[in-house]
Curated annotation (Swiss-Prot):
Keywords: Ribonucleoprotein, Ribosomal protein, RNA-binding, rRNA-binding. GO terms for cellular component: cytosol; small ribosomal subunit. The keyword RNA-binding applies. The gene is rpsT. One of its GO terms (molecular function) is structural constituent of ribosome. NCBIfam families: S20 (TIGR00029). It comes from the Bacteria. Gene3D superfamilies: Ribosomal protein S20. This is Small ribosomal subunit protein bS20.
Length: 87
């Protein structure tokens, strides 16, 4: 347990950041899932629009340090490759 005032404040800050990061990670996964569902259904137009909304979110998550930038790039690259294969 944190004893000093600065340690207690650090715990509060970490809890806030953790909640924000969890929310962003969850949102990113939801958008990726929407793209994958559109790909699975074979709807090229829906997959393209879903990818256009998901890609910036994934890259923003990388900028915020939620996922590594290479991981984000890999996810976007693989999704776009699958979407292009539909067209």
């Amino acid at each position: 347990m944190a004893n000093t005032p600065s340690a207690k404040k650090a715990v509060r800050k970490i809890e806030r950041r953790t909640a924000i990061n969890k929310s962003r990670r969850s949102q990113m996964r939801t958008y990726i899932r929407k793209v994958e569902e559109a790909i699975a259904s074979g709807d090229a137009a829906a997959a393209t629009s879903a990818l256009q909304s998901a890609a910036p979110l994934v890259m923003r998550a990388a900028q915020k340090g939620i996922v590594h930038k290479n991981t984000a790039s890999r996810k976007v690259s693989r999704l776009s490759k699958r979407v292009k294969a539909l067209a």
